Amino acid sequence: MAQSVNITELNLPQLEMLKNQLDQEVEFLSTSIAQLKVVQTKYVEAKDCLNVLKKNNEGKELLVPLTSSMYVPGKLHDVEHVLIDVGTGYYVEKTAEDAKDFFKRKIDFLTKQMEKIQPALQEKHAMKQAVMEMMSQKIQQLTTLGAAQATAKA
């Protein structure tokens, strides 16, 4: 369980260590949200692509992606069914409507995960800001104390 620490009682090296730890946590949470957004965008694009599957497009020619930059010509034969990558190399055949529902559920799940992470990220940012302000105060106190001691010696 996390222990509560009063940052006013910490010295500068301890505050620096705490700031570094908070930097790492903020970076991790920011990266996590960015990765979730990338995956969510892929699901949104996949869901949007299903709109091409209409009866009047059956038999039309199209370009089938082999990689992100290489395509081959193809024909759209079945507009009712699609294969969906469900992870780890497994594909499931679904109707276009079921596929839309699948992608909507995935998008909603990722949105909820990002909403769970966002408050933690904001809290870490606020904690980091408080630590930086305390560090600034401690440095100012040390500077003032050093100047006062130098004046007293003179």
Curated annotation (Swiss-Prot):
It holds the Pfam family Prefoldin. The modification N-acetylalanine is found at A2. This is Prefoldin subunit 5. Belongs to the prefoldin subunit alpha family. Heterohexamer of two PFD-alpha type and four PFD-beta type subunits. Binds specifically to cytosolic chaperonin (c-CPN) and transfers target proteins to it. Binds to nascent polypeptide chain and promotes folding in an environment in which there are many competing pathways for nonnative proteins. Represses the transcriptional activity of MYC. InterPro entries: PFD_alpha_archaea (IPR011599), Prefoldin (IPR009053), Prefoldin_subunit_alpha (IPR004127). The modification N6-acetyllysine is found at K42. It comes from Bos taurus. It is found in: Nucleus. It comes from the Eukaryota. SUPFAM superfamilies: Prefoldin. One of its GO terms (cellular component) is nucleus. GO terms for biological process: negative regulation of amyloid fibril formation; negative regulation of canonical Wnt signaling pathway; negative regulation of DNA-templated transcription; protein folding; retina development in camera-type eye; RNA polymerase I assembly; RNA polymerase II core complex assembly; RNA polymerase III assembly. NCBIfam families: prefoldin subunit alpha (TIGR00293). GO terms for molecular function: amyloid-beta binding; unfolded protein binding. Keywords: Acetylation, Chaperone, Nucleus. Gene3D superfamilies: 1.10.287.370.
